[in-house]
Structures are given as C-alpha cells and as structure tokens.
Amino acid sequence: MPLETKSVEVSRSALVIGGGIAGIQAALDIADNGYQVYLVEKGPSLGGRMGQWSKVFPTMDCAACILTPKMVSVARHPRIKLLTNSELIEASGSLGNFKVRIRKRPRYVDEEKCTACGLCAQKCPVRVPNEIDFGMSSRKAIYITSPNAVPLAYSIDGENCLYLKRGICRVCERVCEAKAINFNQKEEIIELKVGSIVVAIGYDPFDPTPLEEYGFGRYKDVVTGPMLERMTDPMGPTGGAILRPSTGKPPRKVAFIQCVGSRDARFNIYCSRVCCMYAIKDSLIIKEQNPEAEVYIFYMDIRAFGKGYEEFYLRSQEAGVRFIRGKVSSIREDPKTKELILRYEDTLLGTALEDSFDLVVLSVGQVPRADTETISKILGIPRSTDGFLMEAHPKLRPNDAVVDGIYLAGSAQYPKDIPDAVAQASGAAARALIPLSMGRVEVEPLSPIIDEDRCGGCGVCVKLCPYRALELKRKGEKTVAEVDEVLCKGCGTCVAACPSGAAKPRMFTEEQILSMISSAAR
C-alpha cells in the first residue's frame, strides 16, 4: 500500500526574535510581503549592537543615519507588532503552527504619552553604570538608551528604582507633565500562534578579564574595542573624543591588540571576522582626531575579506597606521608615568621587543549571547561546539535551523559583520515566507505508528527523540505517546528504544524486512 502524503494548514504570521539589524531586516522583509510579524526585543529599544556604534566600515557611514530609518519603519509598519522589554519563555508545536509564550516586562512608562522630554531623568536621584557605554558613564534609574531610541519613550529600571525597590521617591511621577509614569503596569504573558520563527538574537562582546596578562580591569588605560567605539560616538561617554580614561586627555601613542578571545585555544578557536576591520576603522578615527598620534596594530593575520575591505586596509597604512605582525605577551604599567609597557614578538624581524603606550585597545571578538542556551532549549535548536546556534546544513541550508520552520539570522548563528548579517536576515525571511505564502505544507509520511493498546506511557521515546516530535498525552484512562508528524524525521530512534514494541515504522516493518531476507536467500 503506498504511503499517503498529508498536508497541514499554516498560521500566516511570523515571530522574529531580536531587534538588532538582522531582526529588523527580517521583520521588514516578511511584513513587506503582506504577513503579520511579531518582533520581540529583550531591551527597551530596537537597534542591537549596531545601535552602539558611531561609524561602520569600510564606508565610514554614520551608523545611526542608516539604522534609525529602518527602526522607524518597523515602528510605523502596519503589519509589525513591536514587543520591547519582552522575551520568549515557551514554545511548542511545529512548522506552520508554533505556539509561543512571550513575557513582556513593564516599562512603567506609557509609550503613547511619553514625549521623551527627559525631565524625569534630570530629577531622578539614582545613578547606575550605563551598560550602553560599557560602564564608562552612568545613567539614571529612568532612562532612554539613545536619543534615536525606538520606541522613543523612557523606561524605568525596576532593579534600581527607589520606589519599586523600597517604596520611596516617585519624583519622576511628580515632575512628568505628560502624566506618562505608570507604576501600576504589570508583567504580561502574551500567547501567539505563528507559522515561522526567525532567530536573530545577536552576540555579546568577549570579556577579556580572564586574560590577566593584558591587565583589563586593573589598568585604566586598557580598554576594549567596543569601549573605544562608544568613545567615538558623539552621544557616547566622551562626546566623540578619544581620551585616556586615566587622564581625560587625548592619547599620543595607541596600541591595538588583535584576536583577543578569538583564534585562541584557551577561549575561542574561531575568527570573529570583524575585529581587524573595526580596529582599522578606529585607528583612522584616531588619526583624524590627532594626525600626530602614533597608532600601532599588533596582529596575527589581517583578514580583510569583504567588499572594499582590502582597500580600507591599504588606506590605513597610507594614513600612517603601523602594523606589527606578532603577539603581545604581556602588559605592565609604569608606576611613575602610568604608561603601559607592552612586551611583544615581531615575527617578521624574529625578535622580542618592548614599547610604551598611552592607550591599549583590546580587539575583542564575538561570543554567543548569554541567553543563547536558553533560546536553544526553548526552541529545540542544537548549538555547535562554539556555542552558536547550529544550522541544518552548513552548505545547503545555512539559514535553516534543524527544526523545520525556524530560521537563523545574523551573529546568532556565527560571527558576522553588518553586510553579512543583513544578507542572511533577508535569506532567513525568504525561507520563512515559503510556508506562509503556500498556506499549507506537505508532511512526508515518515513518522512511526504508535500502537496505543501496547504503549505503556513510559516516556522513553519522548526523552530520546532528537527532534522533540513525541509527547505523552492522556487518552481516556491511559497515558500514551503521540507523534507530531511535522516535527518527525523518521530517524527510528523511538522504534528501536520502545520496550513494548508499540512504536512501529511505516516503512521497513519486521514483516517487510523478513520478506526481503527470505527473497534474497532463495
């Protein structure tokens, strides 16, 4: 008897997780094709990591100038529902019919009423380190991430607000002329049904504190690349000027150390793909601000792989940036002058040398976000050995997760620069649109048949299924295993493991196999 192909109806909407440039691009592509999109962003505003940078390589565009219009497009799009201060907490179902639960934390500010005048922040008595500036500046307990924030509304940090923690203050409520403060807002749980999911949760910068030889955290003038990026931003902690944290004066001699946390067997063996180029970009900004400054880049290999990147590299050399091929082994601070003394090897000269610098910049790489493991478990997506979310096939299905209907975009899958993140986001959106546009998806008849009379409800198959295609359900007086035919790939793990023989394959049954053996033996 031939096996019959089934089809299931698709919920014609999509969920995009992450409000950085990749998530924004994916959401706009899907919505522009006529489908409802729910964009979930953990923070109070869109923008992601790109929103923290001042300029982008190799064109030296203003990052906000090209990012902000897209953020506004998301907020104004009639088919995009933006959920900020929100995170995914539960997911079930399969391609075409995912059921998800979103936790939306209270902002304590009415987005519709808030005019972003800033009076509340001026009067707020609480100061805490500003995570946007990597702790180089402070912010208030009621704050806005940027003047370009979307939505353009303040948010109250519940962990540091005096009223929410101790029941005192409420000064922001008293001074707000728009009456936008609302301490009665509660956490919401939003349940959605979607046909496709795009995961674009981004990355975190590597924390170089464990590299004790570089003195990050001990020496004020040892900073990370992202910290220097914030200095170059006119809205950053130094108003766009690159300054020594110890003195507040422009540095005369700067060293960039490449591959910090990347291409290092102690931490991450992979190349983060952006560090060479952002170091070159920042070196040019330093030379623009102070042409007399000496800038050195200590590198292992310069990887200028993108369009216009090699030319950008050559431009920095022409500007007087010096490149030294070799690894810096240690940094120590002169107790009198406070200069940083670097010991390094110049592999081209074959000698070990020392030199002193005013400012040292650690070009840290990209690592998986802290919540990547949580997202992986909720959605059933495996991670590769480097901790990033794993694609279904590195060559043929680079945008697809192992779970059908879930797609990966940006640095959630592997370190990327902005052009590659945007390109993959559009690719993920195109893949997500296929089931949405079809309205129904065909299901191959690969799943096993569960004999409910023999099934004892032990749950062995549920624990072993690599695709989470089985679950225990109560049917009458019995608990039995049930197969989600869309999730099932027909691997046969449950058939082999079932102690009662209740799980049987649709193909290659015992009778069929014995018949083939009998025929072959004649």
Predicted regions and their residues:
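Residues forming the flavin
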Residues: 1-522
